[in-house]
UniProtKB/Swiss-Prot annotation:
The gene is PHB2. SMART domains: PHB (SM00244). PANTHER family: PROHIBITIN, PROHIBITIN-2. Prohibitin probably acts as a holdase/unfoldase for the stabilization of newly synthesized mitochondrial proteins. Involved in mitophagy. Required for the switch to necrotrophic growth. The keyword Chaperone does not apply. This is Prohibitin-2. The mitochondrial prohibitin complex consists of two subunits (PHB1 and PHB2). The subunits assemble into a membrane-associated ring-shaped supercomplex of approximately 1 mDa. Interacts with ATG24/SNX4; the interaction is direct and plays a role in mitophagy.
Amino acid sequence: MSGGRSPMEEAYARLRQVAEQQQKRGGFGGGGLPGGPRGAGMGLAGLVLLGGAAFVAQNALFNVDGGHRAIKYRRTTGVSKEIYAEGTHFVIPWFETPVTYDVRAKPRNVASLTGTKDLQMVNITCRVLSRPDIAALPQIYRTLGTDYDERVLPSIVNEVLKSVVAQFNASQLITQREMVAKLVRENLSRRAARFNILLDDVSLTHLAFSPEFTAAVEAKQVAQQEAQRAAFVVDKARQEKQAMVVKAQGEARSAELIGDAIKKSKAYVELKKIENARFIAQQMQESGSKNRLLLDSEGLGLNVFEDREKN
């Protein structure tokens, strides 16, 4: 190809060059057609035929890219039932028109403002991953055209969201979000299947309540936390009171047992004398060498009970 011309232009130029050469020679060769106007007419006819053949060859093929499928619309019979896979295929120019569909899954976000069972307004966004049913492409083209997803998905997603959300309270949309998403997915898949649309994934990506409801929920949470804190303080005070009662009872019982032990035997008194003297000596040792004071047995408290015994 020279000068960036198309095959059709190149063939037309060659034919015109051949026709001019034949005209200069006075016809289409010895023993052929006579020259003159008749030869020029035949050259022009050949040029037209060759140009038409080049046009047909250039427009008789169409390609189907990866992830796509194609159908044909015929001027006589309408939409054909054949579905063409990826690759190059033959088509009759003017008589047949190829229609290509992208059959890969495409994401779409649909936002909806709807009301809950307890009449709270909620903004909810649903993300849908959809693709056409390949076997039903002719029917999709007849009923919906090539922009089938734009015609169908926004309306059915809004309808399903409103019907499902109306079954739950506002708080349940948060605590039972998985159940809500499951119901939306099941209902939406059934509705889309009626239009020959397959859904690979349906998820709730955004959930927002009105500012008033959000403030009320926060206030309720704060009140619950304060109530729990107050209950904890009361329970702690009750436990401390019980601990003090138990301690007092234990000390009273201990004093009673000590009194009985003293009455029965003097050995307990002697043991207390020794423990008291040991404690005093340890305290004096830890205080260091300064202000050292020497005490006898009376100062150490070893004679605590001697006067009582003498009396």
